[in-house]
């Protein structure tokens, strides 16, 4: 039997090993110069003014919501078809997640769905740039500006994604992820970009115990060794070990995403003759980062259910993913919002399947997946 082909695998090489070795030998392994370099690199990538590296995108979402003073009595609009961490952070702060439906074929939250969900209690909107494609962020941001509501872009899938010629996060506030399956990774990590100087200042405090400066600031700039707590905060800083890996990966981003795109194109060409439905691409000008390649497996159309397909692929040594089970169908949120109905979200959540897609995949790997899909179509 062939070696198991995972759904995802990080592309690590000698450059990442050398970057870690350099940090370990430097004597400064926690938040330090590599963090600063990573933040500067993301400002350059996105064109935004401020970047704040954090221990995860979830941590970034937590402190961004906190900095916006979102809490009990507030509502935050976001799709249900997203990773549950966003809903969890909203709920843990005492606010109410208002989950809205997505477009049936792009799986993007729409401006119309967002605007129809706004109430006097709405405090923030969190659109998701899904699977590596961009949401219609100009239209969504215009709604936020019209109603005076903050927009926080969930850009966890969007390192290397462009919308109308601009990298995601070029303006406003966006949160990126460096988790192990993302387009660039440092195992765990995240980063917030923003053009709001006051928000950036608050985020830096909240990510490091509520202190006005961190240890590297104090050493570098000679500030008082007894840093003062300005507000209660968290331990969400990123180590320089992680930052060094992320920097090395960022330097490879174009190469990594180009290979993802080539594998995605190979899938697209083959699927044209198969009943499995890939996602539609957004109509607006964009560059897709191809974080995920998702098909919809409708049993009536394909002759096999999604779950049966995933199991059959596993038996053939091929891994798959599910991105995502709709959050409002999870036990906690199902019991909290028992009457919530999101038809497009639910239809897709029962049928979506993420195929293997990662930079070290070969065309032969993709052919193996395609051959298996051809064999299973109609079963």
Curated annotation (Swiss-Prot):
Question: Biological process GO annotation list?
Answer: lipid A biosynthetic process; lipopolysaccharide biosynthetic process; response to antibiotic
Give the metabolic or biological pathway. Answer: Nucleotide-sugar biosynthesis; UDP-4-deoxy-4-formamido-beta-L-arabinose biosynthesis; UDP-4-deoxy-4-formamido-beta-L-arabinose from UDP-alpha-D-glucuronate: step 2/3; Bacterial outer membrane biogenesis; lipopolysaccharide biosynthesis
Q: Which UniProt keywords apply?
A: Aminotransferase, Antibiotic resistance, Lipid A biosynthesis, Lipid biosynthesis, Lipid metabolism, Lipopolysaccharide biosynthesis, Pyridoxal phosphate, Transferase
- CDD domains, per the entry: AHBA_syn
What general EC class does the enzyme of this chain belong to? transferase
Residue spans making up a coiled coil are none
Catalytic function, reaction form: UDP-4-amino-4-deoxy-beta-L-arabinose + 2-oxoglutarate = UDP-beta-L-threo-pentopyranos-4-ulose + L-glutamate
What does the record give as cofactor? Answer: pyridoxal 5'-phosphate
Which Gene Ontology MF annotations are present? pyridoxal phosphate binding; UDP-4-amino-4-deoxy-L-arabinose aminotransferase
EC number(s) on file: 2.6.1.87
* GO CC terms: membrane
> What Pfam family is a match, any one?
DegT_DnrJ_EryC1
Q: Which residues carry this modification: N6-(pyridoxal phosphate)lysine?
A: 182
The subunit field of the Swiss-Prot or TrEMBL record says:
Homodimer.
Q: Which family does it belong to?
A: Belongs to the DegT/DnrJ/EryC1 family. ArnB subfamily.
State the protein's purpose: Catalyzes the conversion of UDP-4-keto-arabinose (UDP-Ara4O) to UDP-4-amino-4-deoxy-L-arabinose (UDP-L-Ara4N). The modified arabinose is attached to lipid A and is required for resistance to polymyxin and cationic antimicrobial peptides.
Q: What name is this protein filed under? A: UDP-4-amino-4-deoxy-L-arabinose--oxoglutarate aminotransferase
């Amino acid at each position: 039997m062939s070696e198991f082909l995972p759904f995802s695998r990080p592309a690590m090489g000698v450059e990442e090993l050398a970057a870690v070795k350099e940090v370990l030998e430097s004597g400064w392994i926690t938040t330090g110069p590599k963090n600063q370099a990573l933040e500067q690199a993301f400002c350059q990538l996105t064109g935004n003014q401020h970047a704040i590296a954090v221990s995860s995108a979830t941590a970034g979402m937590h402190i961004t919501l906190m900095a916006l003073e979102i809490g009990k009595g507030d509502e935050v609009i976001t799709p249900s078809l997203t990773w549950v961490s966003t809903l969890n952070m909203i709920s843990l702060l005492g606010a109410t997640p208002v989950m809205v439906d997505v477009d049936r074929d792009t799986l993007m939250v729409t401006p119309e769905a967002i605007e129809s969900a706004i109430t006097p209690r709405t405090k923030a909107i969190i659109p998701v740039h899904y699977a590596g494609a961009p949401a219609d962020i100009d239209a969504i941001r215009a709604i936020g500006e019209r109603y005076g509501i903050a927009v926080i872009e969930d850009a966890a899938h969007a390192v290397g994604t462009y919308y109308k010629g601009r990298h995601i996060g070029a303006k406003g506030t966006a949160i990126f992820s460096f988790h192990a399956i993302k387009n660039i990774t440092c195992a765990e990590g995240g980063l917030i970009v923003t053009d709001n100087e006051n928000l950036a200042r608050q985020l830096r405090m909240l990510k490091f115990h509520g202190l006005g400066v961190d240890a590297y600031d104090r050493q570098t700039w000679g500030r008082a060794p007894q840093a003062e707590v300005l507000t209660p905060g968290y331990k969400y800083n990123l180590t320089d070990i992680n930052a060094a890996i992320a920097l090395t990966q960022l330097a490879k981003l174009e190469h990594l995403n180009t290979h993802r795109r080539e594998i995605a194109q190979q899938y697209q060409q083959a699927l044209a003759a198969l009943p499995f439905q890939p996602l539609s691409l957004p109509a607006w000008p964009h560059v897709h980062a191809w974080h995920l390649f998702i098909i919809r497996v409708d049993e009536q159309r394909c002759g096999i259910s999604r779950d049966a397909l995933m199991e059959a692929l596993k038996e053939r040594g091929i891994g798959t993913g599910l991105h995502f089970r709709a959050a409002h169908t999870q036990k906690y949120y199902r019991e909290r919002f028992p009457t919530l109905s999101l038809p497009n979200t639910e239809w897709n959540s029962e049928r979506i399947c993420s195929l293997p897609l990662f930079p070290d995949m070969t065309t032969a790997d993709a052919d193996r997946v395609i051959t298996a899909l051809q064999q299973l179509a109609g079963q």
